[in-house]
Amino acid sequence: MEVGAPWLVVLIGAAGAGKTTVARRLFAPDELLSSDELRAAVSGDAADQRATRPAFAILHRELGKRLAAGRLVVVDATSVEQAARRSLLRLAAAARVPATAVVLALPADLVHARNAARSDRPVPTAVVERHLARVAALLSNGHAAAVDTLHGEGFASIVIVMSDGEVARLRLVRNALVSPR
């Protein structure tokens, strides 16, 4: 995956798919905006869904500022709903910043096992199932159709990973030459 700065990277996947692990492995802490961390900042509990609205208000405000300042920003949230992605892409477009979608479409049994193993913030099984269904719907007509859909939403590039092996092989290339400004 090749990115420049400014740039927006949107992680897409169910709770337990490994978005935070990927984000922490590939990006610097100051490049991340995590919905879980912002929920924790608002309410003291990363799993408190009542804090979602104020957490995302902070996320959107901070994202807009960082993109306008010419930064690389990674949004670590499920982003399985098109409306959620649309709000992020609007901010990127306003700052004239390209966006990359990273879709983590791992097997459901692996995602459920990871979610169950979370000691800090397990997500209800029904919620994980909804997330998995959204990701499956995105990929229901194959990779090429998913790429077309995400390009149509406004993503400049798309990465789809379907296994732990593909996640492990995911690499980041920082290239000033791909910057849009």
Regions found by a protein language model. Give the residues of each.
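Short catalytic-loop micro-motif centered on adjacent basic/acidic residues
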Residues: 73-76, 101
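Acidic, metal-coordinating catalytic cores used for nucleic-acid/nucleotide bond scission
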Residues: 76-85
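Short glycine-/polar-rich loops that comprise or flank the Walker A/P-loop
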Residues: 69-70, 95-100, 143-144, 153-157
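Conserved GTP-binding G-domain of TRAFAC-class P-loop NTPases and closely related GTPase folds
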Residues: 2-12, 17, 25, 29, ...
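Aromatic/hydrophobic pocket-lining residues that form π-stacking "cages" and hydrophobic walls in ligand
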Residues: 62, 88-90
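Conserved phosphate-donor/acceptor-positioning beta-strand/loop module used by diverse small-molecule
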Residues: 95-114
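Short, hinge-like loop/turn segments at secondary-structure boundaries
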Residues: 48-53, 92-93, 118-121
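Conserved substrate/cofactor phosphate-moiety recognition/catalytic segment
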Residues: 17-71, 80, 110-112
